[in-house]
Amino acid sequence: CSATPIRCDEEVASTIDSTLACAVTSFPLVYLGLPLSVRKTPSSSLLPLVDKIMRKLATWKAALLTRGERLALVRHVLSAMPVHILMAIVINPSILKKIMRIIRDFLWHGRRNARSGSCLVSWPRLCRPIEFGGLGVRDLYLTGISLRCRWLWLKATDPARPWHHLQLP
């Protein structure tokens, strides 16, 4: 086990260490897959998310899949992988661009590092809902904003929540 004291003196940290028999750690750290930091989350701590998506792609035989099958994998697997992190923290736009480039290359070409000029539809059009002529792929930037706005909505409409007094991102 480990304990991470926040705004505690060294005496309190050593008391925690001796009383709980746990290692005392410090920030930044990873908790439930989320990189936690006292300051803004550095891009380097979000690179494991990009690696996780790349490992997922490596297991699929993309050359054997039709474009429709790749679209289904993009919509239901690849776009869903970063949702847990998007709900809690603001991801650096450079990391989001890397993820969206990986998704785009997989969708259109079935491989990584494809030429962007050979895409059949622009990315903003692709991210539109099906009812509006798009393919229903999530725009990760807008998804992150909407997920974090959900916390603000719950804070405004339900003051009985235990985290109501906390400052939200």
Please place each PLM-identified region on the residue numbering.
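Nucleotidyl polymerases of mobile genetic elements and RNA viruses
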Residues: 1-165, 169
